[in-house]
Amino acid sequence: MQARHLDRRVYFNELAKTSREYFISYVNKFIDLEAHPRVLEIGCGEGGNLLPFAEQGCYVLGIDFDKNKIDSANAFFEEQGLKGDFICSDFMKVPEPQSVEEKYDLVLIHDVVEHIEMPYKPTFLEHMKRFMKPDAYAYFGFPAWQMPFGGHQQICKSKFVSKLPFIHLLSEKQYRRLLQRHGEDEGKIAELLSIKHSKMPVELFEKFVKAAQLKVVKRTYWVINPHYKVKFHLIPLREIWPFTKIPYLRNFYTTSAWYILHQ
């Protein structure tokens, strides 16, 4: 088996562990998982976040435009002996369900919204709503834009650049020059600049949510992202008042913002 497959399996297992330890309890206060709800994940990758929901007996559907990830998701679920459906597509091109019964009780969008460029975020939310049952909930998780690695620069080939915090806050011209100087190829630079164009501070997210006529029923800001427990062996740490209430500045120390939205 290719090293890439082994690496993706590790990543799948890490996501499943975080989902099992944190996502399940976070959404279970609003969704009765014992009732086997229908769960949709947009931008599912290899499906690690969905695995614990499938273990609970939920029907799960994952959508992602990366065929390799969808193929891995199908393989990993089959290995686990669990049922999961996966679609390789741009979510915006997936037709909405034709009946209420085919819609979903819970929609997961984790580490996705910060990759959607600005003009398309409102359209994305409106399309998402068409997949939700009248009393459904949506979970969103994303890194606040100004946090140390909010630009995802950790994906850089250069070990030096990948460890530099806050460089995504440079001007686009300065950022491009820095990336070029340290050998990043044009594809990687384009990806990082797209993330810069798609920036998602929490205040802007809530503005889009309000415009979409969705209600925030729960929000949690993390200084130490729960996924860092399995990734870096760090203990997750929630922000506390008054740090959660400081506009703009909170984006600099919020490594992950979690929201539960309701129709």
What are these regions (language model features)?
Residues 1-102, 106, 110, 122, ...:
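Conserved N-terminal segment of class I S-adenosyl-L-methionine
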Residues 95, 116-117, 149:
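Activation segment
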Residues 117, 132-133:
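Helix-to-beta-strand junctions that scaffold the AdoMet/dcAdoMet cofactor pocket
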Residues 11, 15, 65, 116, ...:
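Conserved aromatic-histidine-acidic binding/catalytic patches
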Residues 111-115:
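Short catalytic micro-motifs in class I SAM-dependent methyltransferases
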Residues 98, 126-129:
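Short amphipathic alpha-helices and their capping/turn segments at secondary-structure boundaries
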Residues 120-127, 137-262:
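S-adenosyl-L-methionine-dependent methyltransferase catalytic module, highlighting the catalytic core
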